[in-house]
């Protein structure tokens, strides 16, 4: 299945891209996608799927739009 992935901030250096369509097998979860594109497992992040917060175990569907962003702090 094809998933559109947008990486925000310094995580794009780990993934090697900032915006790209990726091919994943059916049944891939949010966490499986994030790890497969090279984002380190120990890196805090926020993931959205089609504009809403996504749980790590949530299954993806053809055409989903996923955004991965580091967690920012400060003011």
Q: How should each PLM-predicted stretch be described?
A:
Residues 1-74:
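Ubiquitin-like/PB1-type beta-grasp interaction modules and other compact soluble beta-rich domains
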């Amino acid at each position: 299945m094809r998933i559109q992935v947008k990486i925000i901030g310094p995580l794009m250096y780990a993934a090697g891209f900032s915006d790209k369509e990726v091919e994943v097998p059916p049944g891939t979860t949010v966490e499986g996608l994030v790890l497969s594109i090279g984002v380190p497992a120990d890196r805090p992040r926020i993931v959205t799927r089609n504009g809403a917060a996504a749980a790590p175990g949530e299954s993806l569907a053809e055409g989903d739009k996923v955004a991965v962003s580091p967690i920012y702090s400060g003011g």
